[in-house]
């Protein structure tokens, strides 16, 4: 039986001017779908090498991400990043929390919240400090 982890996170990034998508992806991680899993390098224990390069990733792919830029370039609330999805064979609150904190610490984050449900283990909510 598979272990499923459900994630829904939203980040409000403040800045003067637009934050390039490439900079956001470099910190948050790349999306990988099921087909893309064959292009990832694995170690001798079948663990993903360079995990920090990707969004949190399960056995069928990573979480998904949408980036929205405020068309009003004079507004401090410049960008929102939404990260969501279901991870198969993944059951770690701690890894998601570590990833969430890394994302929050890398930008001027006005607000961020992440709800994680690990089936059979409950729900945890993380917020930026």
What feature does the model see in each segment?
Residues 26-32, 44-129:
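Charged interaction segments
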Residues 39-41:
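Surface patches in mature domains of proteins
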Residues 1-34:
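Short, extreme N-terminal segment that most often corresponds to the first beta-strand
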């Amino acid at each position: 039986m598979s272990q499923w982890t459900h994630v829904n996170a939203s980040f409000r990034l403040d800045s003067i001017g637009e934050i390039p998508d490439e900079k956001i992806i470099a910190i948050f991680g790349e999306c990988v779908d099921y087909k893309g899993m064959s292009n990832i390098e694995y170690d001798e224990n079948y663990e993903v090498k360079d995990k920090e390069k990707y969004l949190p990733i399960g056995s069928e792919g990573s979480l998904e991400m949408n980036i929205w830029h405020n068309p009003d370039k004079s507004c401090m609330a410049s960008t929102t990043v939404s990260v969501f999805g279901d991870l198969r064979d993944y059951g770690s609150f701690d890894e998601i929390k570590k990833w969430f904190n890394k994302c929050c610490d890398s930008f001027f984050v006005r607000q961020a919240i992440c709800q994680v449900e690990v089936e059979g283990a409950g729900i945890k909510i993380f917020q930026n400090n």
